Each structure stands twice: as C-alpha cells, then as structure tokens.
Amino acid sequence: MPISQWPPLRVPPGAMGWVLPQFEQVSPMQVLVFALLGLIIGSFVNVLIHRLPLMILRADMASDHSSDVSTTSSAEPCLGLSTPPSHCPLCEHRLHWYELIPVLSYLSSFARCRHCKGRIAWRYPFIEITTSLLFTLCLFQFGWTLQALMACFFTAALLALAWIDAETFLLPDVITQALLWVGLIGSAMSLTPIPLIQALSGAVLGYSILWAVSWIFATWRGKEGMGQGDLKLLAALGAWVGVWSLLPLLLMASVSGLIFGVIQKMRGQLGDNGHFAFGPFLALSGFACFFLGISMGV
C-alpha cells in the first residue's frame, strides 16, 4: 500500500488531546514530510551554529583593525553561510553530496571524516535528530497548517540560539531580529496563537524588563550582569508568547538558570567570574510557554 494511503495515526480517545490536539488528525505521510524537513533544517541549524560565531568574530576583528581590513580579507578566505562550501573543520576537505545527508552520512562514516579520519562532533546528528523530532511535535500540535510551519521556524531558531549561546556566549542579532519580526508579522496575519496587541506588548515589555534588571545590577555592582543579546531574545520571545506569558517565562528561566548555576558552582565548573549563558534557559522556557500555552491566565 502506498504511504499516502496509510490510515491516520490512532491512539485511545483523549489520550493525547490535552497536549497534542492534532495527534489523531495527521497522517503518516504528513509525519514523514515534517520529520524529513526537520532533518534538512537541522543540517542548516548546524551551519548556523558553526559559522555564525566565526563570522561575528571576523567582523569584530575587522572593525577593531579597520586599517588592516584589506590585508585580513586577502589572507583569510571569505566566510559566509554558503561560502566556502561545506567541508571538514579539521582538514578542510570539501564534502561530497553523499557526505551531507543528515544522520546517515554520520553513521555510514562511523563518526569520522572520510579523508583525514578525524572524529566528527556528535552535535551534528544530535541537532538534526532533535530538529526532526521538534518539527514532528509542531505537526502534532498545530496540524497540517501554516501555523505548524511557523512553529517549526520558532523551534529551529531557538535551538540555534540556545546552542550558540551555550558554546560562545553570543546571541546573533541576525537570528533574534528575524525571530522578533517573524513573530510580529505572523501574529498580524493570525499565523500564531497570539493577538497582535499582545505580541507587540510582549516584545516591548520583554526588552524593558531585562533592560531594567540589567541597569539595576550594573548600578549596584558596577559591572554588566546580562548581555544585550538576552534582552533582544526576550523581546523576540514576547512577540511569540504574548505579554501574559512573560512572567511565567522569566520565572521558569530564572529558577532553572539558578539551579544550573548552583550545580556548576558546586562542581567547580562555573569559572571565576560566575558567568554562564542565560539564553538556553530563556529559549527552553519560551518553547514551553509557546507549546503548552503557559500564561498568567488572563
């Protein structure tokens, strides 16, 4: 029987409706499409995670040494999201098309570069599989709709931001600003569950709250306690979850971040300055508020 004729997924009545309202309405073909789309987008998320911090670093170095820009650009190859083509980060061997197939290429090469035999980071298949699972979750939550695709964009952007921040303490503007504007435009077009006025209020208040916290901390302690990227991320999240979800979102992020910080401090892995990335906790809490509809009940 062709896959397009497979019957819809069936579960006991009401078993999943409380959290995944569209679970019983989607077909296996639709699940397959979203799962494959997740693998493909997950591969692109890996590109963002690897290249965006390097691009930001090079841009900062170029601005610090503006007189040497021509020398630097001639000495180093142009770096973008599509240039140079995908290659091994160890030996810079250009990858063939069959070495770019999500997950399968990693497994078939036994997690090693086919050219230099260097080990490939486990992050690559992990991100691809995670994105695929999250995209499938979006389908179960919103069904075969444009809203599901919007939710896929939301989850992929948060995954990229969380991982980049955890590794580099950076939250690239190109992603946070895209997240903000897509959220606002999607709300205006009724492609997200949040009315436009709540999305606008959430974005403004989200930025303002963390700006106030950051200003108070800097005035009190005489040093910066929160990066500008966190402010922009909460503004973007506010556009997606609305103003009434900001307080629960901040509470969840703060509590989970505090627990993580205490554990890292006890293990002696927090560092002398006591800093750790807050973006992943904002991203995870924003994801929970968006998909579970967590708000102040207004």
Annotate each PLM feature:
Residues M1-M29, V298:
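Short, strongly hydrophobic alpha-helical membrane anchors
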Residues M29-I56:
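N-terminal signal-anchor transmembrane alpha helix
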Residues F34, Q147-S256, V298:
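Functional transmembrane core segments of multi-pass inner-membrane proteins
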Residues N46-R51, F110-G118, L158-L170, W211-E224, ...:
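C-terminal ends of transmembrane helices
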Residues R51-R123:
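Membrane-proximal soluble regions of multi-pass membrane proteins
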Residues E92-Q147, A151, D230, A235-A236, ...:
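Multi-pass membrane catalytic core of lipid/isoprenoid biosynthesis enzymes
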Residues G227-K232, V262-A288:
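Interfacial loop-to-transmembrane junctions
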Residues F291-V298:
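Juxtamembrane boundary at the C-terminal end of a transmembrane helix
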